[in-house]
């Protein structure tokens, strides 16, 4: 899935897809129309994201999902200009999501916030289609969004569709840990974890703030916190040599080996690295060994960045690795083969025909 936007703070425009697919299948839209709706949703997400930076005002990126899903769904439903405007207003006015969902010791709601947002975006479009009216000036009106955010202009850049500039994750965790994971995998073959005295991770400010600024990141007790913990993830990969679900089991959260190594991790912002963000996602890991030697690695582009695109082969392997946790290998391969030809499907209702598991 084309997953993440990084400029301005963070977020996942791909969270719009489930809502858009639901609408498309309900009205039996063709796949080409669904793709157009998704591209439009990404463009709106990007424009909001770049123009407003609502994160600084305490508003979660799930808000962008609500608005962009409403726009994509309105396109699918063929709303008139007037109804389209009501759908946007209905997505904005009742749906201010708070960023506290992604701070401190994270809860299960972190995983539900954007799904709820997409659902609300679909609901806004459906209600507008049925004739429900909404405030005419949701942004600039009295007590509108601008009173919370300050005024901003939506700038729609006219180069290529923004879906092509979104980032893909190689690893199923926060995007700002992706570069560090690749470094840690490389370092695993060079160090004996038992000989590590200290691990110093230098990164850009946003990565530090997102995945290493809270004490809970050093003592995660659930998946939600652990997969947004840079010290935990790096410690686990240094021990295991790879990234996987084994890092997020209840047994692992009580493993004294990884807990001890995690306690030896220091994460700090490097202003030089901050200056490279968001065009680069730089990270430097320096390991201090008990024999006084040091080992250091640096990387500034994770696999899946628009300037370092993930290959089809790597993407397929990621899908199969995740899918086979739920279905058999043969079933996963069949599903993958089916989805790889979705652009040839006439009806969006055929999208899941090859995904049925018996």
Question: What is each of the regions a protein language model found here?
Answer:
Residues 1-30, 37, 44:
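Function-dense linear segments that define catalytic or interfacial modules
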Residues 1-9, 106-119, 126-358:
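Terminal-appendage/accessory-domain detector
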Residues 13-15, 63-66, 311-316:
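Short acidic alpha-helix initiation/capping motifs at coil-to-helix transition points
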Residues 14-21, 65-72, 118-123, 177-181, ...:
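Well-ordered alpha-helical segments within folded domains of soluble proteins
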Residues 23, 74, 187, 191:
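Hydrophobic pocket-lining residues that define ligand/cofactor binding sites across diverse proteins
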Residues 24-117, 130, 137-142:
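Glycine-rich, mobile lid/loop segments that gate access to catalytic sites or pores
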